[in-house]
């Protein structure tokens, strides 16, 4: 597994300090020989007689050589650098289970930390409001501005991580380092404006873990196993804000509101250490570096990666247009994408409204402490795990069964679990709304919370899977704009939850939200049945 650290931050640092001796990449290791197809491709500019001698030498070698991949040669004479063979150890898809597990652990840890940092302030809001004498709305900005920051960040970080000359790791390293440094003044600041500005910046620089985490998992995971990996990643995104109130709920009443921010700093420090060992997972980025090394090794400028060949014909204005304009255009002109953006944003906003409504139910009505309230949030994790066996069974016995038969299932088949999930969302909300009463046991509304989060998990997972397949070319940009929409709606939800429940109460306020999700049930079934017709009419859907 040591060779995987070659392109990790610790590997790059070690190689720089050792003058290239420590953890050298494949092309710089002693005894490396250029694969025969690449040698032949490089000699095509040589005299014909020398080419024939090279070919005769290769044909005379034993037939036990590896099944090398033939490099493509463009009309301009560029040799496209790719994977040397189907078993190339530098290809992330060929890494060992242990190496892939390392990527999973580190990406999920970053995701957990960033989401945990959102909700950990919820337990400190009461004391923060008392200490600084500010209104509830100003206090809620401590959470909502963080959410706004991590929704805005992907508009920059996602396109950046897709550039092969950049890759996944630099955005991770730069952003987590800045996040860690920002967490120090955030933990000690003693004025409201400074704290709120720092919280927004924390969210902005924490967003790469959310924006590109799924892409990192996809880099090392085969198509048939990807739904399992992405669901585990989704569990971490729910577990972060669910565990945060438990951590802060027991410590803040004893140590003060600053303690919640110290806990963020410690978590960020742990993530930073683990991040140093995260290998580069982007295939195009790895091949970009390989092409640079081959040019240095052979002195032949014809060796180029596919990204270098493509960028020669790319216009900067077109790149910016595809990244920033096309997602908005698709949302405006494609009803399927518009519905999924609004629906995902709605259920996400409802989830964040829990941080305002649950204290009204469990502290005000059932006289729980902050720590006990934090334990209630763990029901969100139970909800995601509750539907995990069913989702995995559907993926294995239905979706992947088609792949095993050589059949490519239509994208709408990925929405089948979401049909059930879309029903669970309003059922859970209605149950929570009308059982959140002092005369009923607190377990009953908690069951509603569990059901709603279970449904939300299925909906989000299936919709993302559908968009990735049905709109393959624009999926990265669509996910970035979806992140933005979710964050902005969550920001709004945090801010309007208190006025909503002040005016309507818990029962009627939650019923209003449940009613909005009832309409989305019909939208989900419509997308499932009429999705193929909508895609045929779309200018943006994949064939």
Swiss-Prot record:
GO function terms (MF aspect): fluconazole transmembrane transporter activity
GO biological process: xenobiotic detoxification by transmembrane export across the plasma membrane
Membrane topology: Multi-pass membrane protein
UniProt-annotated glycosylation sites, renumbered to this chain: 94
SUPFAM superfamilies: MFS general substrate transporter (SSF103473)
Transmembrane segments: 101-121, 141-161, 178-198, 203-223, 230-250, 259-279, 335-355, 374-394, 415-435, 440-460, 476-496, 512-532
CC terms in the record's Gene Ontology section: plasma membrane
InterPro entries, per the entry: MFS, MFS_trans_sf
Keywords attached to this entry: Cell membrane, Glycoprotein, Membrane, Transmembrane, Transmembrane helix, Transport
Subcellular location: Cell membrane
Region annotation (Disordered) ranges: 24-71
Pfam families xref list: MFS_1
Recorded superkingdom: Eukaryota
Physiological role: May be involved in the secretion of pyranoviolin A.
Family according to the record: Belongs to the major facilitator superfamily. CAR1 family.
Protein name: MFS-type transporter pyvG
Protein encoded by which gene: pyvG
């Amino acid at each position: 597994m040591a060779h995987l650290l070659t392109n990790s931050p610790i590997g790059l640092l070690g190689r720089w300090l050792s003058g290239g001796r420590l953890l050298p990449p494949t092309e710089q290791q002693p005894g490396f020989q250029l694969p025969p197809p690449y040698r032949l491709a490089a000699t095509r500019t040589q005299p014909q007689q020398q080419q024939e001698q090279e070919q005769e030498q290769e044909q005379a070698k034993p037939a036990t050589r590896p099944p090398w991949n033939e490099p493509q040669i463009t009309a301009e004479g560029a040799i496209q650098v790719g994977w040397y063979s189907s078993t190339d150890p530098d290809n992330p898809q060929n890494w060992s289970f242990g190496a892939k597990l390392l990527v999973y652990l580190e990406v999920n840890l970053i995701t957990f930390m960033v989401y945990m940092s959102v909700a950990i302030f919820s337990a400190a809001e009461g004391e923060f409001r008392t200490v600084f004498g500010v209104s509830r709305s100003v206090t809620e900005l401590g959470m909502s501005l963080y959410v706004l920051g991590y929704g805005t960040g992907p508009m920059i970080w996602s396109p950046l991580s897709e550039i092969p000359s950049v890759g996944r790791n630099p955005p991770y390293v730069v952003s987590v380092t800045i996040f860690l440094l920002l967490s120090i003044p955030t933990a000690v600041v003693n004025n409201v404006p400074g704290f709120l500005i720092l919280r927004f910046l924390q969210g902005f620089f924490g967003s790469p873990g959310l924006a590109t985490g799924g892409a990192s998992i996809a880099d090392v995971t085969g198509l048939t196993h990807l739904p399992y990996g992405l669901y585990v990643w989704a569990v971490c995104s729910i577990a972060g804000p669910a565990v945060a109130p438990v951590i802060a709920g027991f410590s803040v009443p004893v140590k003060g509101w600053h303690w919640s921010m110290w806990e963020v700093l410690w978590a960020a420090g742990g993530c930073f250490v683990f991040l140093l060992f995260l290998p580069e997972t982007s295939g195009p980025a790895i091949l970009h570096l390989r092409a640079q090394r081959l040019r240095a090794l052979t002195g032949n400028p014809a060796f180029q990666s596919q990204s270098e060949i493509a960028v020669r014909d790319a216009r900067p204005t077109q790149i910016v247009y595809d990244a920033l304009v096309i997602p908005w255009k698709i949302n405006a002109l494609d009803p399927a994408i518009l519905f999924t953006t609004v629906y995902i944003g709605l259920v996400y906003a409802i989830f964040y409204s829990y941080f305002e409504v649950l204290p009204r139910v469990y502290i005000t009505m059932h006289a729980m402490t902050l720590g006990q309230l934090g334990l209630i949030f763990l029901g969100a994790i139970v909800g995601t795990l509750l539907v995990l066996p069913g989702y995995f069974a559907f993926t294995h016995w239905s979706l992947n069964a088609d792949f095993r038969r050589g059949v490519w299932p239509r994208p709408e088949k990925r929405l089948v679990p979401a049909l059930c999930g879309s029903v669970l969302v309003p059922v859970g909300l209605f149950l929570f709304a009308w059982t959140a009463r002092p005369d009923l046991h607190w377990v009953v509304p908690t069951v509603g919370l569990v059901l709603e989060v279970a449904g939300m998990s299925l909906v989000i997972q299936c919709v993302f899977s559908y968009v990735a397949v049905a709109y393959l070319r624009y999926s990265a940009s669509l996910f970035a704009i979806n992140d933005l929409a979710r964050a902005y709606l969550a920001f709004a939800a945090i801010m309007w939850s208190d006025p909503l429940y002040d005016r309507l109460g818990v029962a009627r306020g939650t019923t209003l939200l449940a009613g909005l999700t009832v309409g989305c049930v019909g939208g989900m079934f419509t997308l499932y049945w009429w999705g193929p017709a909508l895609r045929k009419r779309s200018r943006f859907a994949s064939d």
